[in-house]
């Protein structure tokens, strides 16, 4: 993947955010109100959200450990690519969160958005979503089989939905998070090819 495509993705994400500011509280808050119920059974959606960080940690560790035990250098190297995508994703997500500093929807609309819990960091982009899509995309790049790709992206998409259902994020936070995660995985793949080409 060319670096030009990565810059283009970043510009699209920024454009989405600033376009959203221009249209402010219209379609986005209406959609979020439809997704986020005032009285809900949060358990399933909460568990989906909570699955992100344990899976993100366990996946590359398991890949590396199995690769080490089986003396499988390829699998070990694939675990590095996953870690790379997660590190890039975390860096970009946090940089965007603190530079844009978007208010959480439940702070801006306390009478119409009902959060499961209140997060302390900024809203844009969704960190859970970006991390889920970084992992899903990285795994899909490594294992291009439908039985890997479909469950990975289904899980990542359900994480994004859960963040809105729980009242934690606007739809554009989730879309931007998905874009950042996908871009991070492809950037990690590209960097690995450049750094480790024989």
Spans of features found by a protein language model:
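N-terminal transmembrane-helix/juxtamembrane module of multi-pass inner/ER membrane proteins
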Residues: 7, 16, 20-63, 67, ...
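Transmembrane helix-loop junctions in multipass membrane proteins, especially transporters and channels
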Residues: 68-75, 101-106, 168-172, 193-198
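Membrane-embedded catalytic cores of phosphoryl/pyrophosphoryl-handling enzymes
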Residues: 110-198
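Hydrophobic, lipid-facing residues on alpha-helical transmembrane segments of integral membrane proteins
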Residues: 83-95, 99, 175, 179, ...
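Residue-level signature of transmembrane alpha-helical entry/exit and packing/kink sites
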Residues: 56, 77-82, 149-152, 174
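Lipid-exposed faces of alpha-helical membrane segments in multi-pass integral membrane proteins
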Residues: 55-65, 88, 92, 151-158, ...
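Juxtamembrane/transmembrane-helix boundary motifs in multi-pass membrane proteins
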Residues: 4, 41, 69-77, 81, ...
């Amino acid at each position: 993947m060319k670096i030009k495509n990565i810059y283009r993705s970043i510009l699209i994400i920024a454009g989405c955010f600033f376009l959203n500011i221009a249209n402010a509280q219209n379609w986005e808050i209406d959609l979020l109100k439809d997704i986020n119920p005032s009285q809900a059974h949060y358990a399933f959606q909460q568990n989906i959200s909570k699955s992100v960080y344990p899976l993100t940690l366990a996946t590359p560790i398991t890949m590396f450990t199995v690769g080490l035990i089986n003396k499988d250098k390829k699998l070990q190297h694939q675990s590095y690519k996953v870690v790379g995508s997660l590190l890039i994703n975390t860096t970009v997500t946090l940089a965007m969160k603190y530079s844009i500093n978007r208010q959480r929807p439940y702070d801006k609309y306390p009478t119409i958005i009902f959060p499961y819990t209140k997060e302390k960091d900024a809203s844009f982009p969704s960190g859970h979503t970006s991390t889920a899509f970084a992992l899903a995309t990285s795994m899909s790049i490594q294992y291009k089989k439908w039985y890997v790709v479909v469950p990975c992206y289904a899980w990542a998409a359900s994480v994004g939905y859960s963040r809105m259902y729980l009242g934690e994020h606007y739809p554009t936070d989730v879309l931007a998070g998905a874009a950042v995660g996908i871009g991070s995985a492809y950037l990690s793949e590209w960097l690995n090819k450049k750094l480790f080409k024989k």
